[in-house]
């Protein structure tokens, strides 16, 4: 049994029992195994407005680690997972540093908040520890804030905007149109608004209004009244977390009929809104209805274990853990610098889609397919999860994957 300085065995057992009684948001999970395990740190929001997404992330990373260990681990060594609630940027930084300095993790995986992702990446860079971001979208993390030891399986905001933008252009909702946007008032939202304005300017549209919304806001009625008065051609959501769920529910209650679309999206938030409350066109990095053998297996395994299908955050954390294990096996090393070199050489990874993905060397963004989903009419909804139809993969099969990503001119990255 490995020991943990400052935490007695009795404290760990009591905490674990409390965590089992209260669910995954309880005491941080620490698995104790043989001394030659590979320790990996997992940080993600498990409380607050991003907590519902963090719950999927934790469940998925547990599933991935259990599968890896059941298959013999990595190079004969089991993975030991240390999981913590990242809470906020300052706490995320503190916990990341503790994981590296005290717990000697080989790498860190996770996060959803772009602000917390930035502080974790600073620790990772200073300590030369691999950090694989699974949920932070901001272009800035791949641009001004890019780091040698940070990689992104989650798509950047530009990829979300360009993917959804294709559908909006096809629907005639861009050129000459007026948009009313609602934006989460933190790093992710600010970055997404900047990217969406760039897209709109390039395609002949304009904003009737853009409103910043505090992350703890729950009452959208004043903004809905403004939307009603503005009579926009399209209402755009740059919201995040349970903001999206609350907005969609209240939009329906107000009886507004203006088309809705979003540039930031997680399927769990649409599920939370409920039947009849999900509207419009949205981009997504992955969803549970993708028709590939790998997706079908993941959905079946996750649903059997947790009683519900996985959503896109679950996809990100699950695949991040799997690709880290794959890279460690291929390099026969857990050294972060060697793993960085392996990723930068164009290693390919199966991501449950029709094409393999790879990390772009210039900014460490995963190049992979995305999708646009369209809310189904209520009469066509058969259950609480299958509430949308999906586009084919974006980009198309004859297009390069990089076509939807930010160009170097749009988002320059200069790594030290």
Feature locations, PLM:
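Extracytosolic ligand-binding ectodomains
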Residues: 2-17, 24-416
């Amino acid at each position: 049994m490995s020991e943990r300085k400052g935490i007695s065995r009795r404290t760990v057992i009591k905490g674990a029992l409390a965590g089992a009684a209260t669910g995954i948001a309880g005491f941080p999970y620490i698995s104790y195994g043989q001394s030659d395990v590979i320790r990996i740190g997992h940080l993600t929001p498990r409380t607050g407005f991003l907590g519902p997404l963090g719950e999927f992330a934790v469940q998925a990373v547990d599933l991935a680690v259990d599968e890896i260990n059941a298959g013999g681990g990595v190079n004969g060594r089991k993975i030991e997972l240390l999981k913590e609630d990242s809470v906020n940027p300052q706490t995320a930084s503190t916990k990341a540093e503790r994981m590296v300095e005290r717990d000697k993790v080989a790498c860190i995986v996770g996060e959803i908040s772009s602000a917390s992702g930035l502080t974790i990446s600073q620790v990772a860079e200073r300590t030369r520890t691999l950090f694989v971001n699974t949920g932070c979208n901001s272009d800035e993390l791949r641009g001004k804030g890019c780091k040698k030891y940070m990689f992104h399986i989650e798509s950047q905001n530009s990829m979300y905007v360009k993917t959804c933008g294709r559908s909006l252009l096809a629907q005639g909702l861009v050129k000459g149109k007026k948009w009313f946007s609602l934006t989460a008032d933190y790093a992710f939202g600010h970055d997404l608004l900047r990217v969406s304005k760039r897209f709109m300017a390039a395609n002949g549209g304009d904003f009737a209004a853009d409103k910043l919304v505090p992350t703890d806001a729950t009452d959208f009625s004043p903004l809905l009244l403004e939307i009603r008065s503005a009579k926009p051609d399209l209402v755009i959501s740059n919201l995040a977390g349970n903001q999206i769920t609350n907005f969609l529910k209240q939009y329906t209650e107000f009886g507004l009929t203006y088309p809705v679309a979003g540039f930031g999206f997680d399927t769990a938030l649409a599920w939370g809104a409920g039947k009849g409350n999900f509207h419009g066109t949205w981009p997504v990095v992955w969803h549970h209805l993708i028709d590939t053998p790998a997706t079908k297996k993941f959905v079946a395994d996750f649903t059997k274990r947790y009683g519900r299908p996985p959503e896109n955050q679950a996809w990100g954390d699950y695949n991040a853990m799997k690709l880290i294990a794959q890279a460690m096996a291929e390099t026969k090393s857990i050294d972060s610098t060697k793993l960085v070199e392996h990723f930068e050489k164009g290693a390919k990874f199966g991501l449950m889609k029709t094409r393999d993905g790879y990390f772009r060397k210039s900014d460490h963004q995963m190049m992979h397919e995305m999708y646009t989903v369209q809310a189904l009419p209520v009469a066509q909804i058969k259950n609480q999860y299958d509430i949308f139809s999906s586009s084919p993969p974006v980009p198309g099969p004859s297009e390069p994957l990089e076509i939807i990503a930010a160009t170097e001119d749009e988002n320059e990255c200069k790594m030290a």
